[in-house]
Each structure stands twice: as C-alpha cells, then as structure tokens.
Amino acid sequence: MPFALGQRWISDTESELGLGTVVQVEGRMVTVLFPATGENRMFSRAEAPLTRVIYNPGDSVESHEGWSLAVSELTEKDGIVIYHGIHSETGEQVTLRETLLNHNIRFNKPQDRLFAGQIDRLDRFGVRYQCQMLRHKLASSDLLGLQGPRVGLIPHQMWIAHEVGRRYAPRVLLADEVGLGKTIEAGLIIHQQLLTGRAERILIIVPDTLRHQWLVEMLRRFNLRFSVFDEDRCVEAYADHDNPFYTEQLVICSLELLRKKKRLDQALDADWDLLVVDEAHHLEWTEEAPSRAYQVVEALSEVIPGVLLLTATPDQLGHESHFARLRLLDPDRFYDYDAFLAEEDSYKDVAIAAEALAGNAKLPDAAINSLTELLGEKDISPSIRLIQAEGIDAEVQQAARSELLQELLDRHGTGRVLYRNSRASVKGFPKRFFNAYPHAMPDQYQTAARVSGMMGGHKSLEAKAAQALSPEKLYQEFEDNSASWWKFDPRVDWLIEFLKSHRSKKVLIIASQAETALSLEEALRTREGIQATVFHEGMSIIERDKAGAYFAQEEGGAQALICSEIGSEGRNFQFASHLVLFDLPLNPDLLEQRIGRLDRIGQKNDIQIHLPYLEDTAQERLMKWYHQGLNAFELTCPSGHVLYSEFAEDLLNVLVVDDSDELTNLLNHTQSRYKELKHTMEQGRDKLLEINSHGGEKAMAIVQRLAQNDGDTHLIGSVIRLWDIIGVDQEDKGENSIILRPSEHMMFPTYPGLPEDGVTVTFDRDTALSRDDIALITQEHPLVQTGLDLITGSETGTTSVAILKNKALPAGTLFLELIYMADASAPKSSQLYRYLPPTPIRVLLDKNGNDLSAKVDYASFDKQLSAVNRHIGGKLVTASQPILHPLFAKGEEYAQVVVDEMVAQAREKMTQQLSAELSRLESLKAVNPNIREEELEYLRNQMQELNTYLDASQLQLDAIRMVLVSHV
C-alpha cells in the first residue's frame, strides 16, 4: 500500500480507535497513531488491515477545531488529500488538509457498500448483530473479568477478586491460609484489571522454583500469556530494546534476577501498572537492617501504582514481619511499628463487636458500648433497638446486623488493605486420613549407606539428611546403570499391590526426584503392566498437559500419575483422593504443597494419604516428626515454616544419627511449641477481617450469578454460529467437548489464538476443571473475543438483502433494517464502557419512514426471511435507491434520539455512582486512614474525563438489511 506521513486511515479490526494518522513509514513497516485513544499501532505495509479515508464531493467533513467543510472538490499533494469547500461557520471558501481532520469522525461505510453492490450473505448479517449484542452484554456486566477464568466458583475467591479487581491501582495483602487459593485470587484480580483496562503492564515476582507454576497457572486458568524473564532472556531482548522489560507487557521473573542493580534499575524504569509478589512473607525486614530482597520490592512498590502481596497468614511469622509487608503497601499509613501495635490492640474492641453482630443472639452490653463508641459519628440506636427487640421479623433483624457490620468494616481495621481467609471460616474442605506402611531396610541399601558413611565425611548436615531420606538414589550412585533399585525395594512391591487392589481408583504418587518418578513408572509397566504416566520438570508444558489429561481420563486413562516434587507444582488433581508419598520432603511447606495437589476447595472425597517407609531409618524419624510433632498429614500446619526454622538443626541431627532419646526429646519440644503457636493463632483471629474476607451472602450472590451465566444456552448457540460463519472446523469429541481447528476455507487468513493443530474446548466448567487440556469457553475467552473482533472489526455482515414471504403484505413492500452503534472513542482505562457500553440500536423502517422496531422484534422477523443471491440483491438495491436515500436520514434521526437519551442516562449514572463513592470515601477517610488519597484523586479525574468522552460520543451505522416482500 502507498503510505505517506499525515495520511488518515482507519483500522479494519479496531474501528473503535477512531481516525488514525500515519506518523512513521520505515522499511516494510508503517506506524499509525490513533489520537482519540492515544494508542499507536505498527503494521506490515504489505498486509496492513487499514482502509484509506478519502471523502467525495458532497460529503461533509469536520476539522479537529470543530468546524465543518462541505466538500466541493479535492486535490492531492505529496500523497496528502486536500479538501476544498465552504466553511460551515463563515461561509468562506477554504481548504482543509486531511491531516487536520477530526480524529473522532465515524464512517457510515455500510451505505457505500450497499449501493456498490457489495452485499453479504443473510446469515452473516445475523451473526454480526449477535456479535454486537454479545459485546454489549460483556462490557456492561459488573462481573467483567470473573466469568472467563477456568476456576471453580468459590465464594470467598470471587468476593475478593470482585472487591479488589474493580479498584484503581489496588494495593492489598492476600493472606489466605494454604489451600484457599491465593494464586487464583491474584489471577482473577490480574484478569479483571487487564480486561477492564485498569492495567496493561504487569510484573510478577516469584521464587525461582515457582516461576513455571505461575506461568502454567496464568496460561491454563486465565488465558494470559506471560513471559518468564531470566538473565539469558534479558540479554536476548537487547536486540529489540535497550530495556529488556519493555519487550513484553506481562512478565514473570525471580527475585534473584532483580537483586542485580542493573536489572532492578531497568525494572524500575519499565512503567508497570501492577506488581504481584508471591511468597512475600520471605521478605525479611527489621527497622535497622532490611534484607536486599525487601529493598528490591520496596523500591518497585514506590514507583508501581498497584501492588498485590501474596503471603502466609499474618500470624504465621509474627507481627513485625506482618507490619513490614503492610509498610510496602502504604508507608505513609504504616510508618511506625509501635504505633501499629497500639492500633492493633484497639482492634480487639472491634472484634468483640463484630463477633456479637455476626451471631444471632442479643447483643451484650459490652458489645453495645463498643459499637456506640466505635461508630460515634452515627446514630445507631434504631438499629440496636431492632436487634434487641422481641418478635421482630428475622430478616429485618439480620438486615440491621448487616448494616452495622458494614459500618464497622468501612471504618475500622485493615479491611481494604488485608484479606485473610482461614479454613475455620471457609467451609467445604475434605478430611485427611494418614496411613503408614513400614518395611524392612534392604541389605543393598544398608551396604550403600555404610560405604557412603566412610566416604562422605565432608558433606553438610543437610546433604547427609537428604541422602539418608533417599537410599535408592544413593544406591544408584554406587552401582552402574544396569542396576535397578526398584527390583528389590519393598516400597515398590507394596505400591504394585496397592494399585492392584485399588484398580478403580485414581492414585497420585509423588517422589522428590524426577529420576525416581521415571524408575517407578518403569517398574509398574514392566512388572505388572499397570497404566501409569509421569510428570516431571524435564517435560514441556504440552507434554505435562497430555500426561495430566491421560490421568484425568475416566475410561482408558492412566490409573496412576507419578510426579516429581518440582514437576507437580501448579497442578491440582481434585478428581483423585488417594495420595502416595513415596518419600518425604524435608520442608513442611513442601509436604503441605504435595497434599495440596488433592486437598483443595472442590475436592469431593476425603483424602487418603499413604506413606510406605523403611523402618528404623531417617524416613521413619521424619514421618514421626511430621505426624506426632506437627500433625501435618491430617491437618494443615500454618506454623510449619516457623517450627522448621526453630527445630531444623535438631531435626537434621536426629535424621542423620539414630538416637531414640534425642528423637523423643525433639518430638516433645515440637508438640509443646506447636500447641503454643496454635493457641496464639486462634486467639489472634480477627472476626471482622474474616467477615470482610469471605464476603458472606454478597459472595454467594456473585457466585449464583456466575453459575447462571455458565448455563446460558443462547451464548453457546451464538458462539457456535460465530465459528460456523468464520469457517472454523468443529468436531464433537464427546465428554461435553469439541475440537476446533482452522480450515482452508476460513473467512479470514488467520484466527489469532487458534493453534494449527487445533484445541479442545468445552462450555461446561466442571469438565474444564477436571481436564487441563480442555479450554473453558465463556464470553471472556480469547477465542470468543477474537471471533467477535474479527466479525465486528471487518465488513462482514454490514450489508444484506432478504425476501419476506408474507401474503398478508403487498408484494414489493420494502423494509429497511438499520443497526447503529452508540459508541465513544476512549481508552479502556477510562472505564467509559461501564456507563456507555458499545450498544447496538435497531431501527426497522417501512417505506414511509415509520419505525416498527418496537412492534416487530428481531428474532421473529429474522425467522421469516429468505436469502437472495448477491447479483439479484444488487439489482433490487439499485431499483430501490430513490426510496432508500430518505430512509437513511430518517433512520439516523430515530437512532440519534435513542443515543442522546443513552448518553444522558450514562452521564447521570456515572455522576451518581462516582459522586456517591467519592463522598463515601471522603467521609471514611476521616475515620479510616486506609483510604488512600490516590483513590480519591483518581475518582475526581475520572469524572472529568468521562464527561469529556461522553460529549464526544457519536452514532455509527454498523449494518443494513433491506427486505422486500415477495409472494413467489
């Protein structure tokens, strides 16, 4: 295409960007700026999805200054069109270079296509209209961002995501207990922030071992393609940009990478919108000597507007550590540790009042006094009288309790900054049962251990303990590859018998090392032909998906999945309830992570944990410490990290040297400290915080709405028709799933996001949750969004001609169906779509210009129509032109009335909602310092911006259908 600087083009795929200007032509690329949204797009000159905008004599064009020009002629100079005509305000003869056209101009292209005989198939018009309706429905939903992720509809998770994800630059601490889904909550918030335009650039910082887990979670659950950055990736990225972090929008990296000053400086300069830090409780801090890791996150949190910290429960690592994390979120608010402790003491009165309100009994005097003092600026006596009165309707009393609870939540505690759910407050978890199976130590292992003892004097205590826990690895090191430990290890014999006696059960087996997992698979296959598959860190994501799918398959699938420690990260298998621990990890957190593969919300059965171990070895001693000291097999142990830190040296000594007295002493001390920590945590429970974190009835209402949307058969039918029109091959696979593949006859050359070898999808959430290799299709899924964009961003379905066979009407009767879009060009981040979403406006005119759309609905009218071929349709349009021209003007009049009303309603809704929220936050700021000034300033600016965008809203003709009555 011939491009020149200053020319005006419109994007065929993103028409909402408005009129674009060519700002750079270099080599094979052209860059177009879209001033209406402030966005740049770079295209290949040869294949740019752009249409040149040139007006004709008779057209009216608008300058960027607001005045119009009635075009009489046009000339061209250096590739730039110059329009000549009459100035609308002065009446003078003037010229206007195309570069100075108003960038908010919209184009009624369907009219031009109709009169040029470019007529689409009838079904494409219908699909286009449905696509616009789907876009409107999605944009106007207050649950935008929650429907699409492949996650269970868990109330507390959806509540936190709904509350936090809607905020501008949220800065919160997610501190749920293990197994309650902090990663999912963070993913939901990220998904919402991206989909709503509140964030575009996101940096996730995780420990080295969790980078892959986050990559998998973000892709498989949220359809978000993050890039993992390490030193090698940074070096490679220099070819594209001086700052490697600018080469991707969504980045995962480790703290280790950012410890390097050069990389940290680059990250600080990369203009992120949201920072997410996992395992934030490992950021060590003291007032005198904060750790390097803490300083890295602190520096980033000072320049990045939004911050999510994922951490262990606040009680787990002590108050000072908890304060340090809150300080990262708001250093002005949490500036002094002593002041923080004093404030925490005052929360006890709040907790007492909250506990009383959350119950059903009458309020004790102490609670009433606390409430009166805490809510001093509000007269609460009417609510108190309702709660205390006899014979009052239970719903009325509950409403009064809820109102006072909400007042407490708004005004006290860290509810806007901290979310923490515990298993005590969230129901739905299975029970855990521990089964241990002792076996004698084989002679071969004893010999290998003796030889190693003579040779390994230089090894560290931890290395010796790890060696003692994995005798099979030690044996294999001393023997050549022809020796196979699994031929004599009694644990393998037990495993084979166990699987044979539980043939109908799915069994997850976890071992520390990938080599162990591979050997076990070989043993099961060669000795008994048991169907098992492996899952380890040496496999690609696709290979792991296939292994997981093979295991999940009910018929013909693997009975057992054998995972390595690292390989199992980020994968959950709730459909299985038997877990075999072939060995034990040294760290209690890793043990909980193993059990957590099955022990999640959504697990429908009790979990049976099986441990085959070698008697009188380090394996037995570690098992006793976990079971008798921490009760870590049958209950989650939030204090496991603290206990391991305190007793690590004693534990390692006991594992390396068999001393029964030392073991007994260690178990007694561990039990005592475990009970002490458990009691402290129970005492420290903040009832108000728990109520705010799990959301109660409001959370249930959100989940019910999402569940209703899941069963929307209209959506399923619309999406299937969309894929049919585009030409995507669809093969029914059974199990509520279909395979989508690109075909040779697709309407578009490519379908972004649809792999060449296809993808298996389902509309059923339960099916998607049980199968990692099946994508969950909702209106938010990229394959649906891309399909909608392909249709609505192209000319597909913009014109159509149809026949209405109805003898009750005279033959030749003409109807003109016009679909307009009420829209305004605005950046996603403005949130304009919440008040004025892209809205299709249907006008159905008879030949006299009467609008029949209120009397004749779209669906019933569409069913009566028959298609005509393009050639005949063109002739019918040509013959009807004298009637059609005045009807277009009439249709625009009707649609403009609707748009004006919609804009007025949008302005009223926006002003009402934002003013109310601003007023609420301003009044709360006086009593709750957790309200940030940045949030208030954002709301004030947003109101001004939205009014400007609403003023610029316009009407755009999107599609035309001409209908003629025939009796033939």
Swiss-Prot record:
> Entry's CDD domains?
DEXDc_RapA, SF2_C_SNF
Cross-referenced SUPFAM superfamilies: P-loop containing nucleoside triphosphate hydrolases
Per UniProt, residues of the Helicase C-terminal domain are 491-641
Question: Which EC number applies?
Answer: 3.6.4.-
Entry-linked SMART domains = DEXDc (SM00487), HELICc (SM00490)
Domain Helicase ATP-binding, chain residue ranges per copy: 163-332
PROSITE patterns in alphabetical order? HELICASE_ATP_BIND_1, HELICASE_CTER
Q: What domain of life does the native source organism fall in?
A: Bacteria
What GO biological process terms does the UniProt entry carry, in alphabetical order?
Answer: regulation of DNA-templated transcription
Any one Gene Ontology molecular-function term assigned to this protein's record? ATP binding
Which family does the record claim for this protein?
Belongs to the SNF2/RAD54 helicase family. RapA subfamily.
Q: What does this protein do?
A: Transcription regulator that activates transcription by stimulating RNA polymerase (RNAP) recycling in case of stress conditions such as supercoiled DNA or high salt concentrations. Probably acts by releasing the RNAP, when it is trapped or immobilized on tightly supercoiled DNA. Does not activate transcription on linear DNA. Probably not involved in DNA repair.
Protein name (record) = RNA polymerase-associated protein RapA
Q: Which organism is it from?
A: Shewanella baltica (strain OS185)
What is the primary gene name for this protein?
rapA
